[in-house]
């Protein structure tokens, strides 16, 4: 069992039940999935860039990546409907917990000039989204084999009903929010 999953069961559930006075253990918010998204707009000119992005995400997630395609044509961006312009992967279960552990303990501390995560990046329903400017903060990415530094979006979806519950859930995992 993943370390943070055990922490959730042993400590976080009790802490949140006490803090929000839940009557049932099933009311306690939990993380349901983590979505990683990498937009590669430059893939229009060079298809190899998308392949490198897919390889990076596969190394991070340990599972197959879905290539996202443009939904409609935009002349200003020189894209047509159906052009591959990014990739994403959704993590659930054990892989999600393993990635979350690496994100909190390894990747976030390696961010350059890090002053804490924005506590206002919740969507109103307890889900948290954050952007990472460099994929090289993850230990799975070999720095010497990186062709270009790319960023990615990381969305943590929870069962929390409010932002306050979601913030308390992530803070219980020692998520480094700005004060």
UniProtKB/Swiss-Prot annotation:
GO biological-process terms attached to the record: translation
Keyword Amino-acid biosynthesis: no
Keywords of this entry: Ribonucleoprotein, Ribosomal protein, RNA-binding, rRNA-binding, tRNA-binding
Name used for this protein in its record: Large ribosomal subunit protein uL5
Family: Belongs to the universal ribosomal protein uL5 family.
HAMAP family: Ribosomal_uL5_B
Gene symbol of the encoding locus: rplE
Quaternary data: Part of the 50S ribosomal subunit; part of the 5S rRNA/L5/L18/L25 subcomplex. Contacts the 5S rRNA and the P site tRNA. Forms a bridge to the 30S subunit in the 70S ribosome.
